[in-house]
Amino acid sequence: QYLHRALKENKRILLEGQLGALRDLEHGIYPYTTSSSPLAGYGAVGAGIPPAAIKEVIAVTKAYSSSVGTGYFVTALAGEEAEELRKRGGDAGEYGAKTGRPRDVGWFDAIATRYGCRVQGATACAMTNIDVLGYLDEIKICVAYEIDGEQTRDFPATPRLSRAKPVYVTLPGWKTDVRGVTNYDE
């Protein structure tokens, strides 16, 4: 009743999901999925409101990639490079909140992010944790995959993903601590 009343009064309602589109049972990387849908469209179902009531979908992504558990991870880093990013990531590093298990980390994957935004129906995308990358001389962004000798910018939510190799552009890092910055002029 509360949400229906708020809708009737034209109040703003914020619904928040967890996980990401790639963990969705229908549109994610099966079998590395979850049993319930993390897609924005299911927010209406969970909240008990009409789907048409959702006017904006803001996809939220980190400036680098991370993953818990098994599954395909095209931009995964290894060794010291991964450990340094893992240590600096998030509020307490990229470690499981309850288990303390290290998460897999990697470069930003624009192909997976675009796919996730598409299946979410995102009207905007917010990027977080940019400050984490402030120690790097260079930052890589995956802009395509090479699969079986061919480049693609389409995300294959199929076993073909296991053969994907990242195609990167390399950008200069900013080598500055940007924590606490609240506007572009800073």
Residue ranges, per PLM feature:
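Non-transmembrane, aqueous-exposed alpha-helical and coiled segments at domain scale
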Residues: 1-186
